[in-house]
Amino acid sequence: MQLNKEQQAAVECVTGPSIILAGAGSGKTRVLIHKVLNLIAKKKVPSREVLMITFTNKAASEMKRRMGATQLGFVGTFHALSARMLRIDGDQIGIDKNFVIYDESDQLMLIKGIIKKIHTNFSPKYFLHRISAAKGELIQPDNYLKIFMDYSAEVVSQVYKEYQLKLRKNKALDFDDLL
């Protein structure tokens, strides 16, 4: 499939790192593949020095498939790259290299166990949402109450602290921890 003018310009722009922002089905993966192949073939960039990072496993799988036998430094999601880095150097920041990654069902099960003890009417998903939002803003459990003062902040802070303690005890990280 041919590249349009804008896509070809993106492929040929080689002045530094690239980010391709476009809607679904617009050819982002095709542009990235052509760009990487162009860098390797024409600019003599060593293939093992190329990182191709995306948001979804589906896109990462597609990039790997389309690259074929070309061996790159890394092709995968942001989460996968972070997990790889933490498995190599996580001990430098107190993370066991053999950590497990909790998905949403693991997280909800953990939260359900915590909230059984405190008798709250809030759902496990409510706590998961609030904890995820806090992590996205880099708010640690000990600082939660200093920042949030709504009617549920105290109980969320309590659950968040216990949640983090249990993750650490279980040598686990959630997807928010990876980023």
Give the predicted meaning of each segment.
Residues 7, 25, 56:
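A sequence-level detector for short glycine-anchored, His/Arg-bearing signature motifs
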Residues 15-16, 37-179:
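A basic/glycine-biased coupling hinge at the interface between accessory DNA-binding modules
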Residues 1-2, 23, 115-119:
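Short amphipathic alpha-helical boundary/capping segments
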Residues 1-15, 175-178:
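N-terminal pre-P-loop "Q-motif" helix
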Residues 15-34:
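Walker A/P-loop
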Residues 8-11, 29, 40-43:
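Short, flexible, glycine/charge-rich loop motifs used to bind or transfer phosphoryl groups or to couple energy/partner
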